[in-house]
Amino acid sequence: MSLSDPLGDMLTRIRNAQRARHAACVAPASKLRANVLEALRREGYIRGYAQEDLRKGVAQLRIELKYLDGEPVIKEIHRVSKPGRRVYSKIKELPRVYAGLGVSILSTPRGVLSDAEARAANVGGEVLCRVF
């Protein structure tokens, strides 16, 4: 299956699994997806993830979702920069998500970082998604 936006597909799988109260979900593996999941794990939005090999050359990511008192930790997760319209931001121009309660995930020259990590490193980049 050909996807025009693989990262958007993974974010949709996470959103749907959380709404259905699943403990975990799976998505095809890629380096960008794994890096975004690592940033979400560091920020406390998911419990963890693991790469599983299905067969030679084909892998998937198993994403362990996180809940607090039975409610999903991720209330909203949206793709910002899309294949048809890329969104780049200097770090000084990057707005805070819900006045600092949420997180933006950026692809920077230093790797995939949360907005707080990017501000500390003073580096901007492509705004991949916003999470609250």
UniProtKB/Swiss-Prot annotation:
Q: Which GO terms describe its biological process?
A: translation
Q: Does the keyword Signal apply?
A: no
Q: Which UniProt keywords apply?
A: Ribonucleoprotein, Ribosomal protein, RNA-binding, rRNA-binding
Gene Ontology molecular function terms on file: rRNA binding; structural constituent of ribosome
Would you say which domain of life the source belongs to?
Answer: Bacteria
Matching entries from SUPFAM superfamilies are given as: Ribosomal protein S8
Q: Where is the signal peptide?
A: none
One Pfam family name from the record? Ribosomal_S8
Q: Which cysteines are joined by disulfide bonds?
A: none
| Gene Ontology CC annotations of this record | ribonucleoprotein complex; ribosome
Database matches in PANTHER family: 40S RIBOSOMAL PROTEIN S15A
Oligomeric state and partners?
Part of the 30S ribosomal subunit. Contacts proteins S5 and S12.
As for what it does, the entry says: One of the primary rRNA binding proteins, it binds directly to 16S rRNA central domain where it helps coordinate assembly of the platform of the 30S subunit.
Family stated for the protein in its record: Belongs to the universal ribosomal protein uS8 family.
Q: What is this protein called?
A: Small ribosomal subunit protein uS8
- Name the species this protein comes from: Gluconacetobacter diazotrophicus (strain ATCC 49037 / DSM 5601 / CCUG 37298 / CIP 103539 / LMG 7603 / PAl5)
